[in-house]
A protein has these predicted regions:
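Residues at the starts of beta-strands that form the adenosine-phosphate
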Residues: 7, 32-35, 50, 107-108, ...
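Active-site-proximal region of nucleotide-activated glycan assembly enzymes
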Residues: 107-156
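An aromatic- and histidine-rich active-site surface loop
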Residues: 86-105
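N-terminal subdomain of nucleotide-sugar transferases
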Residues: 1-42
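Conserved nucleotide-sugar phosphate-binding/catalytic loop shared by glycosyltransferases and other
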Residues: 12-14, 32-68, 141, 152-155
Length: 156
């Protein structure tokens, strides 16, 4: 049975972060959900879940700041149209504006640190750790980096 009262935004950059997010498809199907991810040259099938796309951001590019600002405006538009109650994010850079908007609008933010990070935190994780209502790590060792994080196992 689908919970239509709770709207959930699932946000991730492309590649492995999106693959981790898609491992939560049963959760997506349980709620009124939509996905926000980066537009890439390759297509990822997320049907039948609604999907919005942001510009792909690489922190080493000269246009990084410009793309982040553009993504912030795009994220605001998505947020105002969809009005999610909760954002679940697996990172990284392109999704930061959406996560911060979530908190500015008084909504709940859940961040899941990358499966690939076993002993050191991501930059996005270090930032969003201070904003997330729930912060999950996928390795028990990561609780040394994030003392208030929850470890409940791995997505994979």
């Amino acid at each position: 049975m689908k919970d239509r009262k709770t709207k959930v935004c699932f946000a991730a950059s492309s590649g492995g972060h999106l693959e981790e997010l898609l491992m939560m498809r049963p959760l997506m199907e349980r709620y009124d959900s939509f996905i926000v991810t980066e537009k890439t040259a390759y297509e990822t099938n997320v049907d039948p879940i609604k999907c919005y796309y942001l510009r792909q951001v690489n922190r080493l590019e000269i246009a990084c700041a410009r793309k982040l600002v553009m993504n912030a405006f795009r994220s605001l538009k998505i947020f105002l149209v969809e009005r999610p109650d909760l954002v679940i994010c697996t990172g990284v850079l392109a999704t930061i504006p959406l996560c911060l908007l979530c908190k500015m609008f008084g909504k709940k933010l859940v961040y899941i640190e990358s499966f690939a990070k076993v002993k050191s935190p991501t930059r996005t994780g270090k930032l969003l750790y201070h904003f997330a209502d729930r912060f999950y790590v996928q390795w028990p060792e990561m609780q040394e980096c994030y003392p208030n994080a929850l470890y409940v196992g791995r997505i994979y």
